């Protein structure tokens, strides 16, 4: 009876262990694909706890969020025969949940080795074999990232729709030490040349700035002189205009004065012409004689009061 209790206890422990081994957890951002006897079962499992047949069924967790795959120490031979090594290449990619089953079925759960790692090796070797070391190491190095991303994505669109490449980052390749020193020396000389060119450009820019400042100052002086000249011309024109106005006013006044004097004289002459009749002249003569206090002697005194006709008659009688 005691042995039976021990056996029952062992059986319960075994059942408990089997139950524990059948429970598994899928993390958030992952999907679980199940295999039974090496065959892929349909329908990936969502994040959370799941139960499966122990020892018969097993699962693989597949990430469906952004992940970074690293490809290390990739050899690459240039067109000149120089062997270089890319120490690390990072590929940021993401697999959509709807494409997990098809990608795993076609390329296994380690799809990144087939679709990314091998493709990186292939594309880099093709790139290096068609370019010189100078182009790979310096001139075209900034284009390697984008070229790898585009070529990877183009092939994945055909082979594994749903797997997208977000970015590719390539480190500077390792080259033979002697060549590296030559490149560094060349870059140093190039940097010195660029510095000299930039310094020359700065000097030229300063000279150009000074020239422009001188031109601006000269234009400013010329404009000021022109404004002053115009101001003087306007002042002279204003003075001339004022003088003409004053002259016109003076001439008008003088003309009016002369016209008035002429009119007065003319009217006075007309008045005198009307007033100086023979009778009036006789009256004036008598008044003048009567007002004269001088005494005259001679035979002609009586005749002074007669006119010329009377005088001629008197002289005729005397004769």
Curated annotation (Swiss-Prot):
<feature type="glycosylation site" description="N-linked (GlcNAc...) asparagine">
    <location>
        <position position="106"/>
    </location>
</feature>
<feature type="topological domain" description="Cytoplasmic">
    <location>
        <begin position="1"/>
        <end position="6"/>
    </location>
</feature>
<keyword id="KW-0446">Lipid-binding</keyword>
<keyword id="KW-0256">Endoplasmic reticulum</keyword>
<dbReference type="InterPro" id="IPR033294">
    <property type="entry name" value="Erlin1/2"/>
</dbReference>
<keyword id="KW-1133">Transmembrane helix</keyword>
<keyword id="KW-0443">Lipid metabolism</keyword>
<dbReference type="GO" id="GO:0008289">
    <property type="term" value="F:lipid binding"/>
</dbReference>
<dbReference type="GO" id="GO:0005789">
    <property type="term" value="C:endoplasmic reticulum membrane"/>
</dbReference>
<dbReference type="InterPro" id="IPR036013">
    <property type="entry name" value="Band_7/SPFH_dom_sf"/>
</dbReference>
<keyword id="KW-0812">Transmembrane</keyword>
<keyword id="KW-0753">Steroid metabolism</keyword>
<keyword id="KW-1207">Sterol metabolism</keyword>
<protein>
    <recommendedName>
        <fullName>Erlin-1</fullName>
    </recommendedName>
</protein>
<feature type="topological domain" description="Lumenal">
    <location>
        <begin position="24"/>
        <end position="319"/>
    </location>
</feature>
<dbReference type="Pfam" id="PF01145">
    <property type="entry name" value="Band_7"/>
</dbReference>
<comment type="similarity">
    <text>Belongs to the band 7/mec-2 family.</text>
</comment>
<dbReference type="InterPro" id="IPR001107">
    <property type="entry name" value="Band_7"/>
</dbReference>
<dbReference type="GO" id="GO:0031625">
    <property type="term" value="F:ubiquitin protein ligase binding"/>
</dbReference>
<comment type="function">
    <text>Mediates the endoplasmic reticulum-associated degradation (ERAD) of inositol 1,4,5-trisphosphate receptors (IP3Rs). Involved in regulation of cellular cholesterol homeostasis by regulation the SREBP signaling pathway. Binds cholesterol and may promote ER retention of the SCAP-SREBF complex.</text>
</comment>
<feature type="transmembrane region" description="Helical">
    <location>
        <begin position="7"/>
        <end position="23"/>
    </location>
</feature>
<keyword id="KW-0153">Cholesterol metabolism</keyword>
<keyword id="KW-0735">Signal-anchor</keyword>
<dbReference type="GO" id="GO:0008203">
    <property type="term" value="P:cholesterol metabolic process"/>
</dbReference>
<keyword id="KW-0472">Membrane</keyword>
<keyword id="KW-0325">Glycoprotein</keyword>
């Amino acid at each position: 009876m005691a042995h039976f209790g021990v056996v029952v206890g062992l059986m319960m422990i075994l059942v408990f262990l089997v139950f524990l081994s059948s429970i598994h957890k899928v993390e958030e951002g992952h999907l679980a694909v199940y295999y039974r006897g090496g065959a892929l079962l349909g329908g990936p499992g969502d994040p959370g706890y799941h139960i499966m047949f122990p020892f018969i069924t097993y699962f693989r967790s597949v990430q469906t969020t952004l992940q970074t795959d690293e490809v290390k120490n990739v050899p690459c031979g240039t067109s000149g025969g120089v062997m270089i090594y890319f120490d690390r290449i990072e590929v940021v990619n993401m697999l959509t949940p709807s494409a997990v089953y098809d990608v795993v079925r076609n390329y296994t759960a380690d799809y990144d080795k087939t679709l990314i790692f091998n493709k990186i090796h292939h594309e880099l070797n093709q790139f290096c074999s068609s370019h010189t070391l100078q182009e790979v190491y310096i001139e075209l190095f900034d284009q390697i990232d984008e070229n790898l991303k585009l070529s990877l994505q183009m092939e994945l669109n055909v082979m594994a729709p749903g797997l997208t490449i977000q970015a590719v980052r390539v480190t500077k390749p390792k080259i033979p030490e002697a060549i590296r020193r030559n490149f560094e020396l060349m870059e140093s000389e190039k940097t010195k040349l660029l510095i000299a060119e930039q310094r020359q450009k700065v000097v030229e820019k300063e000279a150009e700035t000074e020239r422009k400042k001188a031109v601006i100052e000269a234009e400013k002086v010329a404009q000021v002189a022109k404004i002053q000249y115009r101001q003087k011309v306007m002042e002279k024109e204003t003075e001339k205009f004022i003088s003409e106005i004053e002259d016109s006013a003076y001439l008008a006044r003088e003309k009016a004065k002369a016209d008035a004097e002429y009119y007065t004289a003319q009217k006075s002459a007309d008045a005198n012409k009307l007033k100086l009749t023979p009778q009036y002249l006789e009256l004036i003569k008598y008044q003048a004689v009567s007002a004269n206090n001088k005494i005259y002697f001679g035979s002609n005194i009586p005749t002074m009061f007669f006119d010329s006709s009377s005088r001629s008659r008197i002289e005729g009688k005397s004769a």
